[in-house]
Regions:
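Non-heme Fe(II)/2-oxoglutarate
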Residues: 1-95
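Catalytic core of non-heme Fe(II) oxygenases with the double-stranded beta-helix
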Residues: 75, 79, 83, 93-215
Length: 215
């Protein structure tokens, strides 16, 4: 869903996110496993298997698992953003989303190769805060796959369900069981790619609603 915040709110969130400090060591996959190296753009062709002793890393800042944690840590903006998304996108009415169970910001730059992975939690929300992101030349979108698989040994069964370009003030939503990944940032891009992530709990709902907010 596009333009989920007012222009003033969107600029405020962009400034807060991009002025933050982030810790190296975020993992897109927590298990040690053999894994595919970087796939070609948008996952249209697989590479060869290569041994790895753990996931690739990126920058991250974790804020907490509920509104109380966020306020206690001085990150009221995370609560305010959550409340705006909850109301503006009708998350309760359309997706039966009840509560936030995790909140953090992921940061990637060119040269990092995020892994495909599923999420914990019932539903994942990704907010793109960078309003001037050049998605046509910089990449950095999000690709989502089906069906649900048990692990990377079945990765060849996956088919692309949706590729969502990085457009500022856009919200991406999907069931947490979907294997997905942030797409690599292009070499010509000298910016870091920031994404605000909320993992949520919901009552019912199903992946067939994924196309409710087709872009």
């Amino acid at each position: 869903m596009d333009n989920v915040l007012t222009p003033e709110w969107a600029r405020s969130i962009e400034n807060i996110v991009m002025s933050g400090s982030y810790k190296w060591g975020g993992k897109s996959l927590s298990m040690s496993t053999n894994y595919y190296p970087l796939e070609l753009p948008k996952g249209l062709k697989w590479g060869d298997w290569e041994p790895k002793s753990g996931p690739n890393y990126h920058w991250i800042k974790k804020f907490g698992h509920n509104e109380k944690d966020l306020i206690k840590s001085g990150n009221e903006w995370c609560v305010q953003l959550w409340e705006q998304l909850f109301i503006n996108c009708n998350l309760k009415e359309h997706f039966n989303i009840e509560e936030m169970i995790d909140c953090y910001v992921n940061v990637h730059t060119h040269g990092q190769a995020p892994h495909l992975h599923p999420d914990n939690g019932n539903f994942t929300l990704l907010y793109y805060p960078q309003l001037n992101w050049d998605y046509r030349n910089w990449g950095g979108g999000t690709t989502i796959w089906v069906p649900d698989i048990d692990g990377v040994e079945n990765i060849e069964k996956l088919e692309i369900l949706e590729h969502v370009s990085y457009k500022g003030n856009r919200l991406v939503m999907f069931d947490g069981w979907h294997w997905h990944r942030p797409e690599p940032v292009a070499r010509v891009c000298k910016e870091a790619r920031y994404v605000v992530v909320y993992k949520t709990g919901k009552d019912g709902g199903n992946s067939e609603r994924l196309d409710y907010y087709d872009n």
